[in-house]
Amino acid sequence: MRAPQDDGERAERENGFAMKLYKKSDFPVADIRRFLEPGPVVLVSSAHKGERNIMTMGWHMVMEFTPALVGCVISSANYSFDLIRKSRECVINLPTTAMTDIVVGVGNTTGAEVDKFETFGLTALPAARVKAPLIAECHANFECRLADDALVDKYNFFIFEVVKAHVAPSPKHPETLHYTGEGVFMVSGKIISRRGMFRPELLDSI
């Protein structure tokens, strides 16, 4: 196979796929999150001993299906950190692009100074399994309990078990926000299905 002559030329692979080869330059390792952001930006609500708060979070990942485990990085400087660590629970709420300005506003304020539910006109609903409130305006709410705090002291990394999930029936694929740094978000795009190419046993395992 002849090597491509420049960045824009497509190379014919042995498997028949024609793919573009990209010419690359050095990139700051501290900024790789722009390409490896883990998922949609979420709003995390918490409550403890009469206090409640909401924080904006972009660093989270699904770790297991059953039980449903989610890992989250929550800075110790965040007002929510102590509320969540002491109560050992929270709610992960999924906003859509309709809430973009609220997502930014929540991230720009501290719960030590304002009640973010009141400040941003958000509706707090009682959860079924935890004391932290749901945010009614969000497309989905996932009630969480702290499952493992072994990495909290060293990495601010919480592992939660989702004990109850509430999801709006439509749209099936909501427009969510994905933070790339420097105040810029990407929006979830069109859906591409390759279901027919998957081995059946893998459809629910990855």
Segments predicted by a language model, with ranges:
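Basic, polyanion-binding surface patches
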Residues: 15-206
